[in-house]
Regions:
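Non-globular, low-confidence helical/coil segments that flank catalytic cores
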Residues: 2-316
Length: 316
């Protein structure tokens, strides 16, 4: 029997990595992936554009996010282009401490609301140590995840539209809409009904900055009227329900404006808050004839949605 030398093993491993990288890249190239991660009572959303750019919206309450990411990312991938903290409460930010230790992160987008907790301070300090560029979200900011594909992938910030440093975390929660071709996802964070009404009432406010993680960072874009925003940037295929299905979010008026085919609720099994609340489920049931499909992480685990730019399909 021939001896297998260390050099041979190294070459085989390198070849194997190259093959799997090529397969993975080819599989990802044509689709947008949006995965609502099963991390218990909290929020964590993994987004991967067709060109491979990756964003995580909220990090969940603990290190479980690492396990869930391991199912979606190849083991050799140690970079994440951007993390977004919709609000600084523990159930949205704690997992980012582990992310920052394990992955190279380029950008951190945050709402600007304050939290003096130890975990929030730890995440902020890690971001500083790792040289992560921090940006405060404002309405009109456009984050271009993919400008190379036939259909651009862009995240548009709908809220906040002001300094929210003195607001409660939920009242300043980031709200965004993700668009790829003809498909959209509305991401609500923990935004309460008052923020939903504020978004619905946009009339004359101007939109502001644009940010492109694939290129040179923040840069200005043309301003558009709030009415144009209302008309064109609310309807979405998927509505990520605000605040884990709490009755303090998800008004009938807002659901009607978004007109989703899927409503996704991220909450933990038998959580102490009783999320999702019955009132929210009753509201969503009013739209079942459209039809509206309700998906819950506490029932289904991690929910993976794929878009080809024309339609979303559930992969899991």
């Amino acid at each position: 029997m021939k001896k297998i030398t260390l050099a041979t093993i190294v070459l085989l491993l390198a070849a194997n990595m190259a093959v799997w990288h090529a397969v993975y890249t080819e599989n990802q190239r044509k689709e947008l992936t949006v995965a609502f991660l099963d991390i218990g009572q909290g929020d964590a959303i993994f987004i991967e554009a067709p060109n491979g750019n990756q964003v995580i919206v909220d990090g969940g309450p603990n290190s479980k996010i690492l396990h869930e990411l391991g199912k979606l990312m190849p083991w050799y991938d140690k970079t994440i282009d951007m993390i977004i903290v919709t609000n600084p409460d523990k159930d949205h930010i704690a997992g980012f401490a582990d992310i920052l230790k394990r992955y190279k992160v380029s950008y951190l987008i945050e709402s600007g609301t304050q939290n003096k907790s130890l975990i929030h301070n730890a995440v902020q300090e890690l971001a500083r140590e790792k040289g992560v560029e921090k940006v405060t979200a404002r309405r009109g900011m456009e984050i271009f995840l993919d400008e190379e594909s036939d259909n651009q992938v862009v995240l548009t910030v709908l809220f906040p539209d002001k300094d929210v440093s003195k607001e409660k975390p939920n009242d300043g929660s980031i709200v965004m809409r993700l668009k790829y071709g003809e498909t959209e996802v509305m991401l609500m964070g923990d935004a309460p009904i008052s923020v939903e009404k504020h978004i619905l009432s946009f009339t004359e406010a101007k939109l502001g900055a644009r940010s492109d993680i694939a290129a040179t960072g923040p840069k200005e874009s043309n301003a558009r009227s709030g009415q144009e925003l209302l008309d064109t940037e609310l309807e979405s295929d998927i509505l990520k329900i605000g605040h884990h299905g709490s009755k303090t979010s998800t008004s009938e008026e807002f659901v009607r404006a978004v007109n989703p085919s899927y409503a996704v609720i991220s909450s933990g099994k038998e959580n102490k808050y009783g999320h999702p609340h019955e009132e929210t489920l009753v509201t969503l049931a009013k739209f079942s004839q459209f039809p509206l499909k309700i998906l819950r992480t506490d029932e289904a685990g991690t929910i993976v949605m794929k878009s080809d730019g024309k339609n979303f399909v559930q992969a899991k």
